[in-house]
Amino acid sequence: MWSSWAWTWSWSGAAAVAVAAAAAWVAVYAAAARAAEALWWRPRRVERHFAAQGVRGPGYRFFVGSSIELVRLMVDAASRPMEPPTSHDILPRVLPFYHHWRKLYGPMHLIWFGRTPRLVVSEPELIREVLLTRADHFDRYEAHPMICQFEGYGLSNLHGERWARRRRVLTPAFHTENLRMIAPFVAGTVTRMLDELAERARAGGAGEAEVDVAEWFQRVPQEAITFAAFGRRNYDDGAAVFRLQDELAGYATEAHSKVYIPGYRFLPTRKNRRVWQLDREIRSHLAKFVTGLQSCSSSHGDDADDGGDGGGGMREFMSFMAPAMTAGEIIEESKNFFFAGKETLSNLLTWTTVALAMHPEWQERARREVVAVCGRGDLPTKDHLPKLKTLGMILNETLRLYPPAVAMIRTAKEDVELGGCVVPAGTEVMIPIMAVHHDAAAWGDDAAEFNPARFAADDDGGRRRHPMAFMPFGGGARVCIGQNMALMEAKVALAVVLRRFEFRLSPAYVHAPRVLMILSPQFGAPVIFRPLTSAAA
């Protein structure tokens, strides 16, 4: 009896083990089949699909796609500064993979970011299709989760109806009249910075002072936004947000340069734990801003009081969010507002200052205009800004040559025809903004030269130019909501600087633009400032 039971149990156990082993093998086989489909067979089908339509590119390599060659080209380009040292022909250095592969495969070609196909499109009419006429077929691509965590899950990273709703909520705040309440904070910040610079120039003996404007100009948005949003009493909270975001940006930049591995960000590695801590601290400081924002909203606008702490401007500017958004949504939106507000403005000021230092004739023209419009003593006001035409042309030309975002990406939501080519669903479409801005077909033979006159109101070339040939802040429905704010702040800041100082490049300056998250000078931007006498100003 015992032996019979043991035999039966042994047979049943063996059968169970065999079934489990078979199930495991089936699961392993299915997983391997899915991996092979995702990492090999589908990319090969997509590659053949585009090749049949005459679209080619560097061949797909298992798992890594074109990434290894792309990184090699980027590293090689970054190893050498610009030649000649004041050249604005920076496309081969900033987007070397585009410059290289376009010569081999044409303006429309296929590259691979990991297993994801990216169709590169640089012709303005095709860009119009992606961003305007066929925009319903495309969506903003899914950014790396760490980028989203850093920027915030706000307007720039939302999709569909959630994005449309948020855009409707935010748009009224960026009306021109609302933006102008920020101008005094920018002017006041720059004035304090210039007072310090003038003191340094006097103390130095030579009557001039050298600063790295790539770092120095970060104070403009940082202090203006912090003071306007948090006031004097909570200034340290605002400053902490920027300091913590700077550290988090390093981790986000590193993650952005690598192929994304799903789930890796949840592993308790040393870097991930630090990222989580930084995010918690940023949220904690921003929560105080949200509390003040909600208080401002509950005070019904005109009755709101800053409590004598000097804040209120930014709170009034952003108070429209409080009734329509939760505290968590405001925090996410504020993350992006603080980061984008700082990086976009500081980089625009940096490259404009570098360009004007390279081209003193335009620096002097802008200075004469500022003095004529604003006078010799008063700070720029909202009434002055529309009259600063030359300064506006200079800013546009700087944005053309040195756009903050050198490319943008959209994802095909479904199979869609683009320029006679059928683009499969899931394909990313990359628009190299800098390449379009530097294209001689759109801008003429002097496309690589600094010539603000091309943006003059009476310039015939501007009237003939394709509307998608200039898009420093993107295009279509998802164009940057803060572009007018950045231009307004830059005009105010530069007007204050030009009236008080003349400047030139330091002998230590090395012209080496590169892309991290946005376009920035690889080795900084040291500039020498000399105070102007009242007679010369």
Curated annotation (Swiss-Prot):
SUPFAM superfamilies: Cytochrome P450. Gene3D superfamilies: Cytochrome P450. InterPro entries: Cyt_P450, Cyt_P450_CS, Cyt_P450_E_grp-I, Cyt_P450_sf, Cytochrome_P450_Monooxygen. GO terms for biological process: brassinosteroid homeostasis; brassinosteroid metabolic process. Heme binds at residue 480. One of its GO terms (cellular component) is membrane. Its cofactor is heme. Its EC number is 1.14.-.-. GO terms for molecular function: heme binding; iron ion binding; monooxygenase activity; oxidoreductase activity, acting on paired donors, with incorporation or reduction of molecular oxygen. Exclusively expressed in roots. This is Cytochrome P450 734A5. Cytochrome P450 probably involved in brassinosteroids (BRs) inactivation and regulation of BRs homeostasis. Its main location: membrane. The chain crosses the membrane at residues 13-33. It is found in: Membrane. Belongs to the cytochrome P450 family. It is an enzyme of class 1 (oxidoreductase).
